[in-house]
């Protein structure tokens, strides 16, 4: 009898967000950048306000293929490479102060550490 065991350890999937904390003045442009290392086609941007769950802002199915989520007003996105997905606020408002999360993958999602944006 020959037994063969194949290693199936956890895969380390990384989602990076370039800034953990940002402070901007009202009316300034804001660029939130997200990167991933698994070349997933599907990526997401969410925001989470105190006491609320995640709210989907945008979803991207691949390069230059994006759909609005539940709260797209005041935001736009850019995805020129599969590994990068940026969220853009052209004129930041105080009500956009929140924690923003980028995620990759479908159906299982892997999240970045989040970026806390404060608009003064």
UniProtKB/Swiss-Prot annotation:
Q: Which UniProt keywords apply?
A: Adaptive immunity, Disulfide bond, Immunity, Immunoglobulin domain, Receptor, Signal, T cell receptor
| UniProt region (J segment), positions on chain | 107-120
* Span list, region V segment: 12-106
Q: Which GO terms describe its cellular component?
A: plasma membrane; T cell receptor complex
Q: Which InterPro entries match?
A: Ig-like_dom_sf, Ig-like_fold, Ig_sub, Ig_V-set, TCR_beta_variable
Return the SMART domains for the record. IG (SM00409)
Q: Which GO terms describe its biological process?
A: adaptive immune response; cell surface receptor signaling pathway
Q: Which cysteines are joined by disulfide bonds?
A: 34-102
Query: What Gene3D superfamilies does this protein's entry cite?
Result: Immunoglobulins
Protein name, please?
A: T-cell receptor beta chain V region PHDS203
Q: Write the lineage as a comma-separated list.
A: Eukaryota, Metazoa, Chordata, Craniata, Vertebrata
